[in-house]
Amino acid sequence: MTKAKSDKLTLKHIIGYGAGDCGGCFGLYMVSMFMARFLQVNLEVNAALLATILLIWNIWDAVNDPLMGTIMDICFAKAKPGADKFRPWILASIPIMFVGMVAFYAVPPMLGGGFATIAAAFILKIVFEAGYTMMNIGMGSLLGNMA
Protein backbone atom coordinates (compact mmCIF):
# COMPACT_ATOMS: atom_id res chain seq x y z
CA MET A 1 0.00 0.00 0.00
CA THR A 2 1.29 3.48 -0.83
CA LYS A 3 1.44 6.16 1.76
CA ALA A 4 -0.60 9.33 1.15
CA LYS A 5 1.48 12.42 0.47
CA SER A 6 1.37 14.90 3.34
CA ASP A 7 0.94 18.61 2.68
CA LYS A 8 2.47 19.46 6.05
CA LEU A 9 5.62 21.58 5.95
CA THR A 10 8.70 19.86 7.24
CA LEU A 11 11.21 21.48 9.56
CA LYS A 12 13.65 21.57 6.62
CA HIS A 13 11.24 23.71 4.59
CA ILE A 14 10.51 26.06 7.50
CA ILE A 15 14.21 26.59 8.27
CA GLY A 16 15.02 27.00 4.57
CA TYR A 17 12.36 29.67 4.15
CA GLY A 18 13.50 31.50 7.28
CA ALA A 19 17.16 31.40 6.23
CA GLY A 20 16.34 32.77 2.78
CA ASP A 21 14.26 35.61 4.17
CA CYS A 22 16.89 36.37 6.81
CA GLY A 23 19.55 36.77 4.12
CA GLY A 24 17.54 39.36 2.23
CA CYS A 25 16.69 41.28 5.38
CA PHE A 26 20.35 41.24 6.44
CA GLY A 27 21.32 42.94 3.18
CA LEU A 28 18.54 45.50 3.49
CA TYR A 29 19.51 46.43 7.03
CA MET A 30 23.19 46.70 6.12
CA VAL A 31 22.33 49.39 3.60
CA SER A 32 19.53 51.06 5.57
CA MET A 33 21.34 51.38 8.90
CA PHE A 34 24.53 52.92 7.58
CA MET A 35 23.30 54.76 4.48
CA ALA A 36 22.55 58.17 5.99
CA ARG A 37 25.78 58.28 8.00
CA PHE A 38 27.85 57.10 5.04
CA LEU A 39 26.36 59.70 2.70
CA GLN A 40 26.73 62.55 5.20
CA VAL A 41 30.14 61.74 6.67
CA ASN A 42 32.01 60.06 3.83
CA LEU A 43 30.42 61.70 0.79
CA GLU A 44 29.52 65.02 2.47
CA VAL A 45 25.89 65.07 1.30
CA ASN A 46 23.79 67.81 2.91
CA ALA A 47 21.24 66.47 5.45
CA ALA A 48 18.33 68.42 3.92
CA LEU A 49 19.16 67.09 0.46
CA LEU A 50 19.49 63.57 1.86
CA ALA A 51 16.03 63.85 3.45
CA THR A 52 14.58 65.00 0.13
CA ILE A 53 16.21 62.08 -1.69
CA LEU A 54 14.82 59.62 0.85
CA LEU A 55 11.34 61.13 0.49
CA ILE A 56 11.52 60.72 -3.28
CA TRP A 57 12.84 57.19 -2.81
CA ASN A 58 9.97 56.19 -0.47
CA ILE A 59 7.39 57.52 -2.92
CA TRP A 60 9.03 55.47 -5.69
CA ASP A 61 9.13 52.42 -3.40
CA ALA A 62 5.36 52.67 -2.85
CA VAL A 63 4.89 52.43 -6.63
CA ASN A 64 7.69 49.92 -7.22
CA ASP A 65 6.41 47.10 -4.98
CA PRO A 66 3.01 46.59 -6.68
CA LEU A 67 4.68 47.12 -10.05
CA MET A 68 7.18 44.31 -9.38
CA GLY A 69 4.38 42.01 -8.22
CA THR A 70 2.49 42.71 -11.45
CA ILE A 71 5.60 42.03 -13.53
CA MET A 72 6.08 38.70 -11.73
CA ASP A 73 2.45 37.72 -12.39
CA ILE A 74 2.67 38.67 -16.08
CA CYS A 75 5.91 36.72 -16.56
CA PHE A 76 4.50 33.68 -14.76
CA ALA A 77 1.34 33.75 -16.90
CA LYS A 78 3.57 33.37 -19.98
CA ALA A 79 5.73 30.61 -18.44
CA LYS A 80 5.51 26.90 -19.22
CA PRO A 81 3.09 24.89 -17.07
CA GLY A 82 4.82 23.52 -13.99
CA ALA A 83 7.46 26.27 -13.95
CA ASP A 84 8.51 27.78 -10.64
CA LYS A 85 6.83 31.13 -10.08
CA PHE A 86 9.08 32.71 -7.45
CA ARG A 87 12.39 30.83 -7.52
CA PRO A 88 13.79 32.51 -10.66
CA TRP A 89 13.07 35.95 -9.19
CA ILE A 90 14.63 35.11 -5.84
CA LEU A 91 17.75 33.68 -7.50
CA ALA A 92 18.04 36.65 -9.90
CA SER A 93 17.79 39.08 -7.00
CA ILE A 94 20.90 37.77 -5.22
CA PRO A 95 23.56 39.17 -7.60
CA ILE A 96 21.59 42.39 -8.07
CA MET A 97 21.46 42.98 -4.31
CA PHE A 98 25.14 42.07 -3.91
CA VAL A 99 26.36 44.35 -6.70
CA GLY A 100 24.07 47.18 -5.56
CA MET A 101 25.22 46.98 -1.94
CA VAL A 102 28.94 46.75 -2.70
CA ALA A 103 28.79 49.47 -5.34
CA PHE A 104 26.75 51.76 -3.08
CA TYR A 105 29.49 51.80 -0.46
CA ALA A 106 32.18 52.03 -3.14
CA VAL A 107 30.98 55.37 -4.55
CA PRO A 108 34.25 57.26 -4.85
CA PRO A 109 34.54 60.23 -2.49
CA MET A 110 36.54 62.02 -5.19
CA LEU A 111 33.22 62.95 -6.79
CA GLY A 112 33.21 65.65 -4.13
CA GLY A 113 29.73 65.49 -2.62
CA GLY A 114 28.20 67.26 -5.58
CA PHE A 115 25.52 66.22 -8.01
CA ALA A 116 27.58 63.32 -9.40
CA THR A 117 27.98 61.77 -5.94
CA ILE A 118 24.31 62.15 -5.10
CA ALA A 119 23.21 60.78 -8.48
CA ALA A 120 25.58 57.80 -8.23
CA ALA A 121 24.45 56.97 -4.69
CA PHE A 122 20.78 57.31 -5.63
CA ILE A 123 21.13 55.11 -8.72
CA LEU A 124 23.02 52.46 -6.76
CA LYS A 125 20.36 52.53 -4.04
CA ILE A 126 17.75 51.97 -6.75
CA VAL A 127 19.74 48.98 -8.06
CA PHE A 128 20.04 47.47 -4.58
CA GLU A 129 16.41 48.09 -3.67
CA ALA A 130 15.21 46.65 -7.00
CA GLY A 131 17.01 43.43 -6.13
CA TYR A 132 15.59 43.49 -2.62
CA THR A 133 12.08 44.07 -3.95
CA MET A 134 12.43 41.10 -6.31
CA MET A 135 13.58 38.90 -3.46
CA ASN A 136 11.10 40.15 -0.87
CA ILE A 137 8.01 39.91 -3.08
CA GLY A 138 9.06 36.44 -4.18
CA MET A 139 9.67 35.30 -0.59
CA GLY A 140 6.46 36.90 0.70
CA SER A 141 4.38 35.32 -2.05
CA LEU A 142 6.10 31.99 -1.55
CA LEU A 143 4.94 31.94 2.06
CA GLY A 144 1.31 32.10 0.93
CA ASN A 145 1.86 29.18 -1.44
CA MET A 146 3.68 27.13 1.20
CA ALA A 147 0.87 27.53 3.72
Predicted feature descriptions by range:
Residues 2-147:
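Membrane-embedded alpha-helical bundles of multi-pass transporters/translocases
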